[in-house]
Design a protein with these regions (language model features):
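Conserved SAM/SAH-binding beta-strand->alpha-helix loop
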Residues: 46
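Conserved alpha-helix/loop element of class I SAM-dependent methyltransferases that forms part
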Residues: 1-17
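Conserved class I S-adenosyl-L-methionine
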Residues: 17-25
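Conserved SAM-binding strand-loop segment of SAM-dependent methyltransferases
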Residues: 52-63
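A short glycine-rich, Lys/Arg-flanked "PGG" loop and its adjoining helix->strand segment in the class I
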Residues: 86-98
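Core SAM-dependent methyltransferase catalytic element
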Residues: 140-160
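A short acidic, Gly/Pro-enriched loop at the edge of an enzyme's catalytic core
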Residues: 66-74
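Conserved beta-strand signature within the Rossmann-like core of class I S-adenosyl-L-methionine
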Residues: 97-105
Length: 160
């Protein structure tokens, strides 16, 4: 399975460093990052073995994995929403580090769901950061067709 197109587009512009892939699933993004020089840690509650990647079996909802503070150059969270993780993601990035988050978006005519963000909600979690990409609606690229909110944001070099 191919990596998320937004991840490829974003990571190609960055100097490889330490990457954290939260709720990595099959590991497609972790594999791509590792193949392109990143030192990757992947976390998921389902067992996954990925060559050249430090994998952790952990349930993020139960806080079984602690995100190290100021340790990561890139943190990826694709198609997984746990609102209370955003603070840890922001603290986990080094100054100048990049967060890439793709989550399902609430669509008109659909019932409210705790697994989807409201329009504008994702951007609020990264207020004060440099937003390199923000999109709401059908994915900017990729294989699924559900409405999403996507953000790529850089942590400020100084505290705000």
């Amino acid at each position: 399975m191919a990596p998320t197109p937004l991840l490829v587009e974003t990571a190609r512009k960055l100097e490889p460093g330490r990457a954290l892939d939260l709720a990595c699933g099959s590991g497609r993004n972790s594999i791509w990052l590792a193949e392109h020089g990143w030192t990757v840690t992947a976390v998921d509650r389902s067992p996954v073995t990925i060559p050249s990647v430090d994998t952790h079996l952990a349930d993020l909802e139960k806080h079984e994995f602690v995100i190290e503070e100021s340790a990561w150059d890139l943190i990826v969270m694709c198609l997984y929403l746990q609102r209370d993780l955003f603070g840890a993601v922001k603290r986990g990035l080094k100054p100048g580090g990049v967060a890439l988050v793709i989550v399902l978006l609430m669509e008109p005519g659909h019932e409210s769901s705790p697994f989807r963000v409201q329009p504008g909600e994702l951007a609020k979690y990264f207020e004060g950061w440099e937003v390199l990409h923000y999109h709401e609606g059908k994915p900017s690229a990729g294989e699924h067709h559900r409405a999403v909110a996507e953000i790529v944001a850089t942590k400020p070099l100084t505290k705000r």
